Amino acid sequence: MAARHRAESYHVLENILAFLSMQGVTLNLGGKPLLDSADLSVEIGDRLCLVGRNGAGKSSLLALLGGQMQPNSGMIIRPGTLIGQMPQDVPEHWRGTVFSLVAEVLGEEGKALAAAHAGADHGVEITGGWERYGDVLAVINHLGLNPDADFTSLSGGTKRRVALARALICSEDLILDEPTNHLDIATITWLEDFLLRKARTLIFVSHDRAFAKRLATRVVEVDRGKLHNYSCGFDRYPERREERLAAEERAFALQDKKLAQEEAWIRQGIKARRTRNMGRVRALVALRAERAARRDKQGNV
């Protein structure tokens, strides 16, 4: 019992010390269960790729981690520092030029940078922010954006690039939802290099397998409401996933066999029912409940 208590205490302490963690999180959207008592721990330095079939809840999980959504139950522990976030949907309320919107994430410094870009450069000279100005402009240019373009006039794909630029400038800790969408190969290569050099902690969703293979140091799969961790790169993930599913199928087969045996036993004649073991009956009820709660595998990732 003492050993179990120490193990549970260590698990709680580990989550508290993690950069970002979830404990027992449940999320239902429109009556659809996406997460069921899910746990996750993200350490500083992780580059974590979230995978799962369409509709499994990957974008919702990113929104939970970033604070845009709240769970139905459970706890999410976030860092006190800023996290640069690229959501799936660009906010409709953004207004201004591309440069001003990207620099905006830097707070007062960003306002000074935007003023400098507009020609009132005295604030930046006072704060010594020309190097930061160059960083903002470089990201904007590498993403193929016009810094002086009005945001409301841009296409949907170009607006997503603005959202990506904001995230990259905001923080070295990043949550990115499909960051390579609407990017050409050269820009994707630049983004990969930038993230490898600049990102401290990265959580991302991407259907670009080459991008995931180059960046991911961990893979977490969203599958039937649970989160499955694979401590490997994306290249080894398919093999590890097949191993997990095979083990799961074996466990389910044993459970189904046991359930069938117990159902046959409970249906025996009147004499057997009179002498049946009540503990065995309770175990059968529990088996039925476990089988009813099981969410069968649906499609491929």
Question: Model-flagged regions — what are they?
Answer:
Residues 297-301:
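Flexible loop/N-cap segments at domain edges
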